[in-house]
Amino acid sequence: MASIFTRIIEGELPADFLWKDDACVAFLSNRPLRPGHTLVVPRAAADHWLDLEPELLAHLAATAQTIGIAQMAVFKPSKVGLMLVGLEVPHVHFHVVPIRGPHDLDFDNQDPNPDPAMMKAAGESLRQELRRLGAAGAL
């Protein structure tokens, strides 16, 4: 059975995409920890990050870094957190989260009903910044 991320990548489920390239996609989390919380997901499904080819893992990290640079410019957080957990969805994904402190990385703080206007504004601002940066996969 295809993971929820495979279904999003294939267009079966909606997502607010920020990035698409041949190896991965990035889209806003629908249960954000903070505004701008983005998921970086390889197109090829793998359950565990240790199963990824080193080149793909490096590409995911570089993409996450570029997303994080855009988040710093847009949201002005103290830091950008990066998590690779892999417990809820059997498809490797990086969480890239603009944070003020460690409490912002607690999944108990996810917003299950984020404000649609806030989500739209976050996506538009991040896409604009990624394009300004000249990021190859920016939409």
Map each language-model feature to its residues.
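HIT superfamily nucleotide-processing domains
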Residues: M1-L139
